[in-house]
Design a protein with these regions (language model features):
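Short low-complexity, flexible loop/linker segments enriched in glycine and/or proline
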Residues: 329-332, 353, 375-377, 558-560
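Short beta-alpha connecting loops at secondary-structure transitions
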Residues: 165, 288-289, 335, 379-387
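Alpha-helix capping and helix-loop boundary segments enriched in small/acidic/polar residues
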Residues: 293, 317, 336-339, 386, ...
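PAPS-dependent sulfotransferase catalytic domain
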Residues: 332, 346, 350-354, 430, ...
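Conserved structured core elements
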Residues: 235, 239, 243, 270, ...
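Active-site adenylate/phosphate-handling loop in enzymes that bind or generate adenylated species
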Residues: 347-406, 480, 485, 489-509
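Cysteine-centered catalytic environments shared across enzyme families
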Residues: 1-333, 345, 349, 542, ...
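Adenosyl-5′-phosphate
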Residues: 1-4, 167, 198-204, 214-215, ...
Length: 621
């Protein structure tokens, strides 16, 4: 695992200096503390930071082919590289290292830009093709590894993190207010944009080619495609799931440095640990985070799995003082990011790094197997989408207004009163009607004709399936999974120089899941039914069927107690940069309603706190 960056100047006479690229690479030493390397050739410069995982002594980058015409910088892991290498050697290619990186160089020589279709792994890389004077960049299918870029009239800049690009001279830091609206709606920035108007993300499963002075050519090389196969029985699906997940996990246990696993006690991480134990003669090192608040603490479940498989188990408790981490989190993410589970993810990553360099995680199971609460909710909403909009709005709107705030079930009436955007509304931090009150008039007027909800509604309409659950899964994979879950884990794990591998998001395993009918994913009251059944020979029902807790933080309680003063000092300050955009009276109402117990607004409060800190960290003009 590594960090990459680079610059391509459009003036062919321009000479890139090592100091330029070194300055871009310096802020991501955490991604690669073991080595650095640079390639300079007139108007192209590539920078690299290495975290040594495979072939510890000969994995220096940038790495080239035999005649020095193809150069690569690579961040990630290719798990089928040995198989690919054999095929390439049979075609006459000669290798000088044992790294997966070199395999990509020869694949590019042999297959050109189609080389990415043969890769099984996680990656963000850039190849300089000196013969054709072009830069070829790619990102893995699910976006496990990041790739950012910046384009102006004179150059193309790129990096594993936004901070790489911000180190270059004269990079615009203009804030994109539409992206800020998207952040306040969903808690993260969208798949191809960033909070900075001119800095973009290369989307998952896409490649980018650019020559000096030209426009980037961006292409998709893989896609999510749900094609349910009803010819396969329930038991056959279980066997297919077990075998393919085993294969994926075994591939990801190849490492020349110590390796372990995150263990939350949920079905996904527990399944990963259970299957890892089938391939290791030594106890698996497992790492868990807990809280003193019982409702948020899954440590008892993690301990049960650790005891069952005799793992070398390690635990840590997170307390309210962890709020002191906020400035460091803002620096790690480079842009607003409102998932508070970044706090325990940071601590478990830092904790694990004391023992290992690589961990396997259970991320992706909820998206592939319909594990979130909103999947059953979507079924309920779908029943009422058959009603005319006017009836839904009038009947359920009136019901929503009549029900007191504390009454259970009030929320569902809101979503049913807005059937067309109920899916987006359900997963919003601030709904559209709330944002109209929260935003100052100039901010609201600038975005009201293109609100953030329309972005996800377009994805739903363009989905590959008419099945609502498949649509929801696809929406989650194209937004929440990449922009929240995978972003969260990548930034804070790499902040601690820890590589996190994601076996459930192996693309071949994912393609298998795309064929499983909805009836096997949601059955009765059970989400992820078919995965639970497939894992029953490895895990007890107490693990498989206990109530889903997620990786939440007890902010609801902390904001009423230990963090009450902190919250008020930050958000009620007249000097808060929030109030260039937001109405102080509405923020005050949010805090009041939370403190008095009228509503649980901990997600909204954390969203505002993170944005407040991010704005405070911006250079003053």
């Amino acid at each position: 695992m590594c960090g990459i960056c680079g610059t391509l100047h459009f003036d062919p006479a321009y000479q890139v200096q090592e100091s330029e690229v070194r300055r871009m690479a310096h802020p991501i030493i955490h991604r690669g503390p073991d080595d650095e390397g640079f390639y300079l050739n007139n108007n192209i410069g590539l920078g690299f930071r290495r975290l040594s995982i495979i072939d510890l002594h000969s994995g220096h980058q940038p790495l080239t082919n035999e005649d020095g015409t193809i150069w690569i910088i690579f961040n990630g892991e290719i798990y089928n590289f040995k198989e690919l290498r054999k095929d390439l050697e049979a075609k006459g290619h000669r290798f000088k290292t044992h790294t997966d990186t070199e395999t990509i160089v020869h694949l590019y020589e042999e297959y050109g830009t189609d080389c990415v279709k043969k890769l099984r792994g996680m990656f963000g890389f850039a190849i300089w093709d000196d013969r054709h004077k072009k830069l070829f960049c790619a990102r893995d299918r699910f976006g496990i590894k990041p790739f950012f870029y910046y384009l102006d009239g004179s150059r193309f800049l790129f990096g594993s993190e936004i901070k790489n690009i911000l180190q270059a001279d004269d990079v615009s830091r203009e804030i994109d207010i539409h992206v800020m609206d998207y952040y306040l709606t969903y808690g993260y920035t969208p798949i191809d944009e960033t909070i900075y108007k001119k800095i973009k993300k290369l989307e998952p499963a896409h490649t980018l080619e650019i020559k000096a002075g030209g426009e980037p050519v961006i292409k998709r090389y893989w896609d999510i495609n749900f094609e349910p196969d009803d010819s396969i029985s329930e038991d056959e699906w279980c066997e297919l799931i077990e075998n393919k997940l085993k294969e994926s996990i075994e591939m990801r246990m190849v490492s020349d440095v110590p390796l372990g696993a995150f263990l939350s006690g949920g079905i996904d991480s527990s399944s990963v640990v259970a299957l890892m134990s089938q391939f290791s003669e030594q106890p698996i090192k497992t790492f868990s985070i807990g809280f003193k608040e019982a409702a948020f603490n899954e440590l008892p479940y993690a301990r049960d799995v650790a005891a069952m498989y005799k793992t070398d188990h390690h635990e840590k408790i997170v307390e309210p003082e962890s709020i002191e981490l906020l400035p460091k989190l803002v620096s790690a993410y480079d842009e607003p990011f409102a998932d508070s589970s970044a706090i325990p993810t940071y601590y478990v990553s830092k904790f694990a790094r004391e023992y290992v360099t690589v961990v396997l995680s259970g991320d992706g199971g909820d998206e592939l197997f319909a594990g979130y609460d909103h999947y059953p909710m979507a079924h309920k909403i779908q029943k009422y989408n058959m009603l005319p909009d006017a009836i839904s709005k009038n009947v359920f709107g009136a019901l929503h207004r009549a029900i007191p705030a504390k009454v259970k079930g009030k929320g569902i009436t809101y979503y049913l009163s807005r059937p067309k955007d109920s899916v987006s509304a359900y997963i919003s931090k601030f709904h559209q009607t709330e944002r109209e009150k929260l935003y100052k008039p100039n901010f609201w007027n600038a975005i009201k004709n293109n609100p953030s909800e329309s972005y996800k509604e377009e994805i739903l309409r363009a989905g590959s399936s008419k099945d609502l659950i498949f649509q929801m899964q696809e929406l989650d994979m194209r937004t929440w999974l990449v922009d929240d879950i995978l972003t969260k884990v990548d930034r804070v794990s790499m902040q601690n120089s820890l590589e996190a591998r994601v076996p459930i998001l192996d693309h071949e395993f994912a393609e298998l899941s795309f064929k499983i009918p909805t009836k096997y994913k949601l059955k009765g009251k059970s989400t992820k039914y078919i995965l639970k059944k497939a894992m029953r020979k490895y895990l007890p029902d107490s693990i498989l069927f206990h109530k889903k807790q997620g990786f939440g933080v007890p902010l609801k309680l902390w904001f009423k107690s230990d963090l009450n003063d902190y919250m008020n000092d930050r958000l009620m300050s007249k000097n808060s940069p929030l109030y260039e955009f937001l109405e102080p009276t509405y923020v005050k109402k949010i805090i009041h309603d939370h403190q008095t117990g009228m509503r649980d607004f901990n997600f909204k409060i954390w969203t505002l706190l993170f944005l407040d800190e991010w704005l405070n960290q911006q250079p003053k003009s």
